[in-house]
Amino acid sequence: MMKLLLSIATAAVALSLSAGLAFGEDFEVRMLNQGKKGSMVFEPDYLQLQPGDTVKFIATHKSHNAATIDGMVPEGAKGFKGKINEEVEVTFDQQGFYGIKCSPHFGMGMVMLIKVGEGSLPEHYRSVALPARAKPRLDALFAEAEADQGKP
């Protein structure tokens, strides 16, 4: 009888652990006209995720969307483009860095960076053509990502 109870308990623990690995965490990013870091921002503007985590981009203010920046998506990963004024949920399965923009406000510097899993920022991200106001914001996010390198 004791062996049966031990087997059932072991199976229950194994099942609960495997179920926890199957589902990622959920995050929310607000798209704002005005935020803590100025006008036309994502909050937060930098996220560290694990593969399988999901981000819900919330159009808190009108005229925003979330879309990947050309040239700033990990090799083998698909980009995405949400519709204006609509929430979009994206599950990030591929490790690497994702540059994200608001299409209508890219020229105003509305960008964010998402890091999924481990790894270093690809050097070619620094040479991607960007609007003048987006470049300093992304450079600051690149520095933040590099400062987090190796942290859990």
Where are these regions (language model features)?
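Extracytoplasmic/periplasmic copper-protein system
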Residues: 24-35, 108-152
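N-terminal signal peptide c-region/cleavage motif recognized by signal peptidases
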Residues: 18-19
